[in-house]
Amino acid sequence: GEADWIVEAVVERIDIKHKIYEKIFKERKSGSIVSSNTSSIPIKVLSEKLSEEEKKDFCITHFFNPVRYMDLLEIVKSENNDLNKISSLKKFCEKDLGKGTLICNDTPGFLGNRIGVYAMQVAMTEAFKMKLTIEEADAVFGRPMGIPKTGVFGLYDLIGIDLMADVLKSFIKELPENDEFQQVAKEIPLVKKLIE
């Protein structure tokens, strides 16, 4: 491949991602950046099968949904990265893609999802406790709360209910048991039913 930057955006399953990386790193141009669009899997897990040289060129570029309308992009770096490449990638994403770009450390959910997924889970949990309809919940937990006009349930659906289930599993695995996120990370019966 002749690309300067290759973005992996497959399902949130580490086994599939590792197989893809094996193929990408065999074919890529030497020195090109390879990134994952994961929303929750730590870079240390994603890169565990990469060589030290490959790790220098690997990072996470987490684009928020809907990508066309959401300005935020998180670049998650590791201690292995060539920081000049990360800086160049950030500049490209800001100037050429028009993204508001944050450089993040490798923490569960990075920055945006650590806050955003928690807020979505709290909103959905409270909506069910209050016996709100989905429409009522989306009216309250939408634009007035800084969530896209889809509202919280609409956003959950837009992201992908099955993807959100994988994200929650990743958070549950990575966060300590006493973390407040664990209180709201349990499956919501309606969501579970929709996945089945």
Which residue stretches match the model-derived regions?
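N-terminal glycine-rich phosphate-binding loop for ADP-containing cofactors
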Residues: 1-196
